[in-house]
Amino acid sequence: MNQKSLTKLEFPKIIEMLTDHASSPGGASFCRRIKPMTDLNKIITAQEQTAAAFTRIVKKGIPSFSGCYAVSDSLKRLEIGSALSAPELLRIGKLLQTTTRIKSYGRHENADDQADCLDVYFEQLAPLSLIHI
């Protein structure tokens, strides 16, 4: 889609509104990079994911992503053998707590809950539930 069409459709304003609702800096950065899709299969998949997310939100409420910090710099420092500071360790701990909370949100509470296309994403989360902060 060309820039003139995007401007006419007020796409930048829509992206700005979406970014304002992001609950983490990483989420806001992701929102700013969104471009319109043109592949029909990808569009259909995204619509299915959106419908599944909406259904989960209606049933369970909006999940909290508070404590979702970018820790990639800390992980790079660890890879080269550096020690982490206390604030870095706390951020990693908070991220692990958030992971546990989101993994729990993704569980099906009872037999009535049907599997959906988002399950694969929740299954990939590996919280370390034995860590306490």
What label would you give each PLM region?
Residues 1-131:
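Conserved amphipathic alpha-helical "coupling/scaffold" segments
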